[in-house]
A protein has these predicted regions:
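Catalytic alpha/large subunits of respiratory electron-transfer oxidoreductases
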Residues: 1-146, 162, 180-190, 201-224
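Catalytic or ion-translocation cores adjacent to nucleophile or general acid/base/metal-coordination motifs
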Residues: 147-161
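A short glycine-threonine-serine/GTX helix/turn-capping micro-motif
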Residues: 162-170
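Short, charged, surface-exposed loops that flank catalytic or proteolytic processing sites
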Residues: 169, 189-193
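Catalytic-loop motifs flanking and including active-site residues across diverse enzymes
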Residues: 172-176
């Protein structure tokens, strides 16, 4: 957070990059959008994993659960440009959530970015090549340890329920983001998933009128 405070004071938040993931819940994504928006960091994108086998009917190429949710929240897609900026020394801080970038963009590019950055943070559930290159790694909870929602490829918002407590020091991404907001003195608060979704449903038009109760077991379609 110290590096972000320094960049804010120097009016250099254009040199902060944030790469979110389509594996994050709607609550995680919204928390990131709100917090980095309040901070004034505008270079916030999401990245899908590599495409898998598909038939474009029942089997989708995108194996992640929430690209549609990221799009509905108005988050731009694609991490390559930010990585290239980082490798050229145009960014000073880069935060990456969940997605291993090495299989998508080569180890050489991610390594060059890591060397050029003042601070490279990876928030994720598993050890991977991107985490190995990061300067700081924060453990996050897997989906089985989270409450929240995903939006499937048809635009149906669906509930997930935590089956387990987060392992060790890991926590939901929205909670990690909430700590960052508090450390930066921001007004955005991330206390628990239901309150984040309630705010999301008030402020994001595609989700308006939804609640965990109305989503229920069947899900609810995004508004067009």
């Amino acid at each position: 957070s110290t590096a972000l405070v320094q960049l804010r004071e120097a009016k250099q938040l254009n040199r902060v990059g944030v790469i979110l993931s389509s594996y994050l819940t709607n609550e995680d994504l919204y928390a990131a959008k709100r917090i980095f928006g309040e901070l004034g960091a505008t270079q916030v994108v999401f990245q899908r994993p590599p495409s898998g086998s598909h038939d474009d009917f029942l089997i989708q190429a995108d194996k992640s659960p929430n690209a549609k949710g990221a799009q509905a929240l108005g988050i731009a897609e694609g991490a390559e440009e930010l990585l290239e900026e980082a490798a050229k020394g145009e960014l000073r801080v880069l935060l990456v959530f969940t997605q291993d970038l090495v299989p998508l963009f080569t180890e050489e590019l991610v390594q060059a970015a890591a060397k050029a950055l003042e601070l490279f943070v990876f928030v994720g559930t598993n050890a991977n090549p991107t985490a190995a290159l990061a300067h700081l790694v924060l453990p996050s909870a897997v989906y089985a340890e989270k409450d929240g929602t995903f939006t499937n490829f048809q635009g149906r918002v669906q509930r997930i329920h935590a089956a387990l407590d987060p392992w060790g020091e890991s926590r939901p991404d929205w909670a990690i983001l909430g700590d960052l907001a508090e450390a930066l003195g921001l007004s955005t608060r991330c206390v628990y998933a239901p309150s984040i979704f309630a705010e999301l449903a008030k402020t994001e038009r595609p989700f308006q009128g939804m609640s965990y109760q109305t989503i229920g077991d069947q899900g609810a379609l995004l508004k067009q």
